[in-house]
Design a protein with these regions (language model features):
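A short, Lys/Arg-rich alpha-helix, primarily the initiator
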Residues: 1-18
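Recognition helix of helix-turn-helix/homeodomain-like DNA-binding domains
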Residues: 26-41
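The alpha-helix within a helix-turn-helix
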Residues: 11, 22, 50
Length: 65
């Protein structure tokens, strides 16, 4: 199962709202909702998040058994 809990923690640590991230990387509300539900998104989106936040993928995504 994919978890984006680390992404939400990273945003909190940086005092950033989800909508700010959405606007900065240019994703749709539907994609933001998928992230919120823990649904799979395109790896390019994950890459763009990592580039924008200047962090590693381990700060964004976690695979839970």
């Amino acid at each position: 199962m994919i978890s984006y809990d680390r992404l939400w923690k990273t945003l909190i640590d940086r005092h950033m709202k989800k909508t700010e991230l959405r606007d900065r990387i240019g994703i749709s509300n539907a994609t933001l909702a998928k992230l919120g539900k823990g649904e799979p998104v395109n790896l390019k989106i994950i890459e763009n998040i990592c580039i924008d936040l200047q962090c590693g993928i381990e700060d964004v995504v976690e695979i839970k058994a």
